[in-house]
C-alpha cells in the first residue's frame, strides 16, 4: 500500500478515486511519567514519554487507515493528513486522527 501526503503519485496515474478513509488512535500517557514530562518540558528538554505515545498513536492510525483502504480494494492512499490532539486538560492522553483518499492506480 502506497501512502502519500500529496494528491498525486509521480509516475503512477490514478485510475479511480474510491473515497475518503479515516482513522483515529488514542494513547494514554502514564501519569507518573507525565509528571517528568511536564518537568522536562518546563526546562525545554524532549519528552521521550510523549514522543513514544505520539509515535505509537500515529503508527496505529496509519495501520487502521491502510486496513480501511484495503477494504475498498485500494492500491494507495493520497492526500494523507495527520492531526494531533491532547483532549485531556491534564495531558493524560494523545489522539491522532488520520485522513486520506483511497485510490486505485492504473
From Swiss-Prot:
One Pfam family, short name: YbjQ_1
SUPFAM superfamilies: YbjQ-like
InterPro entries: UPF0145_dom_sf, UPF0145_YbjQ-like
Record's signal peptide: none
Family: Belongs to the UPF0145 family.
UniProt protein name: UPF0145 protein PputGB1_2909
Amino acid at each position: 500500500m502506497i501512502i502519500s501526503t500529496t494528491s498525486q503519485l509521480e509516475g503512477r496515474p490514478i485510475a479511480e478515486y474510491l473515497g475518503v478513509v479515516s482513522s483515529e488512535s488514542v494513547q494514554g500517557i502514564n501519569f507518573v511519567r507525565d509528571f517528568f514530562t511536564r518537568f522536562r518540558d518546563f526546562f525545554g528538554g524532549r519528552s521521550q514519554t510523549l514522543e513514544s505515545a505520539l509515535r505509537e498513536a500515529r503508527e496505529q492510525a496509519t495501520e487502521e487507515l491502510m486496513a480501511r483502504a484495503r477494504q475498498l480494494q485500494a492500491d494507495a492512499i493520497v492526500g494523507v493528513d495527520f492531526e494531533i490532539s491532547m483532549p485531556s486538560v491534564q495531558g493524560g492522553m494523545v489522539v491522532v486522527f488520520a485522513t486520506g483518499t483511497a485510490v486505485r492506480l492504473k
